[in-house]
Amino acid sequence: MKTQSPQMKLRSIFRQMMEDGYYPVFEKTHIQFSIDENVAILEYDEDIVSVRLFFSIDEEAYEVFLEASNSTMLNTYAVKPAILNDMKNIMFSCEFMCDNIRDFKRFLPRSISRLKEALDTHKIEIKKLILAGQMASATIPATEDSIAGIEKRRKIFS
């Protein structure tokens, strides 16, 4: 007969993360740790583990970050990005159901991997958008002289 693992609590998650080498910081309602030099928060409530990754954005390039976040959301269905109310940070969130440490040990690395993939996708999207903006600003409008010459050379068939 298979025995059930004891009920999982935030404190047991913290201990497991310490054993796995995440160097977490225990807070009253969550656990804070780092993913690729970005702040990550883990919350646990009613058998749902939520891992959130936060990183700062440039306020002047808000629109670019917003568009890149939307594209990231479409490319990574398991990760939900959100720009926070202060307009200075983006949060990527990944949730999974889990009621024991054995499952937690299995699902946490997957969630972190998905968050890293989403962060990489977001960086790629930002680079694409910046490059597209540079290309758009590099185009030079045609002069009226070049447009006027087209009419003389083309015949319109009706």
Predicted region positions:
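Ampiphathic alpha-helical segments that act as solvent-exposed interaction surfaces
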Residues: 68-76, 96, 100-131
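Short, internal acidic amphipathic alpha-helical interface segments
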Residues: 52-95
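A generic structural signal for beta-strand entry/edge sites
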Residues: 28-30, 46-50, 87-91
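Charge-rich, low-complexity N-terminal segments
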Residues: 1-41, 80, 84
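Short amphipathic alpha-helical segments
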Residues: 2-9, 60-65, 107, 111-114, ...
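Short, highly charged C-terminal tails/helix-capping segments
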Residues: 127-158
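A short acidic-to-branched-hydrophobic micro-motif
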Residues: 41-57
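Short, charged/polar, Gly/Pro-enriched secondary-structure boundary elements
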Residues: 38-42, 98-101
